[in-house]
């Protein structure tokens, strides 16, 4: 996102969008475009993000099973929602797109967010918004805080159909995704302990291992 955002800035565009190439459904990109357009047409703030929520995530293996949630997404969303619940005092499942590779945002928002690398990119975007605009930690972006940050999660009609990649790939995704929550200043010590246990239980981390810190790219505009 950081490199793509820089190219968009140089071309003076208002939006930047991302898609993943592992969806086997014909016409998937056309649906993404309509979802992004719908989200931005609803936005009242110039600082807006649209994240695709999959209707189903079936895998291609020996047989077809239409699973509602991806395994990594289910775990990531659990801890994203735990952070929100902890800060608000209300249990919630509102955050459903913690690992949404298909997403778009206005350049006004894109240029003030820090980014992580690899599979930590999408969770870090949300964590960056929580930290900078959650109303608890101080922010250096007063104009954006005044306008408000809008995040739209829009569900597809088509499923996200892709091949089964195995447990090793899931572990490779889970570790960086949860690490951004683990090291966030926004999370509580209790959530930090839960994440550590989760990664050990999922086989993504050995009991004696330290969770690696994600590499964070600073905002393109301070």
Model regions: which residues?
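C-terminal catalytic/acceptor-binding lobe
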Residues: 119-222
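Short, high-confidence coil segments that cap the C-terminus of an alpha-helix
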Residues: 12-14, 44-50, 149
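Short beta-strand-to-loop acidic/aromatic patch adjacent to the donor-nucleotide binding site
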Residues: 13-24
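Active-site nucleotide-sugar/metal-binding loop of Leloir-type enzymes
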Residues: 2-15
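Short, flexible, basic/aromatic active-site loop/helix in glycosyltransferases
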Residues: 44, 48-58, 62, 69-95
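Conserved donor-nucleotide/metal-binding helix-loop-beta segment in metal-dependent transferases, i.e.
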Residues: 25-56
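Well-ordered, non-membrane alpha-helical segments in soluble/globular domains
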Residues: 30-40, 69-83, 123-124, 168-183
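Aromatic-glycine-rich donor-binding/catalytic loop that engages nucleotide-sugar donors
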Residues: 62-63, 85-120, 131-138
């Amino acid at each position: 996102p950081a490199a793509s955002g820089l190219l968009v800035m140089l071309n003076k565009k208002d939006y930047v969008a991302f898609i993943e190439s592992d969806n086997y459904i014909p016409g998937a990109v056309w649906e993404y475009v309509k979802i992004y357009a719908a989200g931005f047409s609803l936005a009242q703030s110039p600082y807006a993000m649209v994240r695709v929520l999959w209707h189903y995530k079936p895998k291609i293996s020996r047989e077809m099973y239409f699973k509602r949630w991806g395994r990594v997404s289910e775990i990531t969303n659990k801890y994203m929602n735990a952070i929100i619940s902890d800060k608000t005092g209300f249990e919630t499942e509102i955050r459903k797109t913690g690992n949404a590779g298909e997403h778009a945002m206005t350049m006004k928002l894109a240029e003030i967010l820090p980014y992580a690398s690899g599979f930590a990119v999408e969770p870090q975007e949300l964590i960056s918004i929580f930290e900078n605009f959650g109303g608890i930690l101080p922010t250096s972006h007063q104009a954006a805080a005044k306008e408000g940050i809008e995040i739209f999660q829009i569900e597809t009609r088509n499923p996200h159909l892709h091949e089964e990649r195995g447990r090793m790939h899931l572990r490779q995704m889970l570790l960086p995704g949860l690490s951004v929550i683990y090291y966030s200043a926004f999370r509580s010590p209790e959530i930090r302990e839960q994440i550590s246990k989760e990664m050990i239980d999922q086989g993504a981390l050995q009991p004696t291992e330290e969770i690696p810190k994600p590499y964070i790219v600073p905002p393109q505009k301070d």
